[in-house]
Amino acid sequence: MASCCPTSRGAAASNKSYTFKGKEIENFGGLTTYVVGSTSNTRVLIGFMDIFGLSDQIKEGADKLADDGFTVYLPDFLEGKPLPVTALPPKTPEDQKLCNDFFSTRISPNLHWPKLAKVVEAVRANHGPNVTIGTYGFCWGAKVLVTYPATIDFVGIASCHPSFPDSADAANVHCPVLFLCSKDEDAKIIKEWEEAFKTNPAYAKSSFETFSDMFHGWMAARADLSNPEQRKRFDEGYQKVSSFFQSLM
């Protein structure tokens, strides 16, 4: 669990004053999905949640990316059963058991690859043969993306405060990557990942950056958007994701 969430922070309160620009649809590739943007768009991003599910923070982030010209899909890969925000960090034996069960049975990447493949199929069916697809993931979601067997389907993968980093995964990735790390990820392992990727032609269009003043989860459910500094860095993170995909599409 420490590798998944290398911080003692729990999820933050959502931004109650914000009005979402997208909508949730019941069945997109078999999953309830938050979508923002036009179905006629050929520039599509698929976001992969963290363990806290379809949080308000990642929906707001999707809206920011849509403002820059992308259509964004946030599928509920945890199918309505994320880890409760009150359970992490665990405060009771019941919380600890809930966390142990969740991490041991719910987050193996291979459980989620077939779901992602169906979402990719749905994107192609909705947006046509000329669509280009990028993906971005938070924490555990980033691990699912870089280990996905068909990364060649994507023009790029953005990994935001990635969990379970392993340099062996670099050999599986066949597109440019953006790593946006916090102070909580293991810098040595991230550097090993980058070094392993340097022989890949996609490295030339890749970037590895660290927000040394931010914590694991600052672009997702742990972001307190009422805090001016966290809001600033949240916005900067999404701008970097946007610029990365703008350069590839």
Curated annotation (Swiss-Prot):
The keyword Cytoplasm applies. Signal peptide: none annotated. It is found in: Cytoplasm; Nucleus. Keywords: Cytoplasm, Nucleus. One of its GO terms (cellular component) is cytosol. GO terms for molecular function: hydrolase activity. It comes from the Eukaryota. Belongs to the AIM2 family. PANTHER family: DIENELACTONE HYDROLASE DOMAIN-CONTAINING PROTEIN-RELATED, DIENELACTONE HYDROLASE FAMILY PROTEIN (AFU_ORTHOLOGUE AFUA_6G01940). This is Uncharacterized AIM2 family protein C30D10.14. It comes from Schizosaccharomyces pombe (strain 972 / ATCC 24843). The lineage of its organism: Eukaryota, Fungi, Dikarya, Ascomycota, Taphrinomycotina.
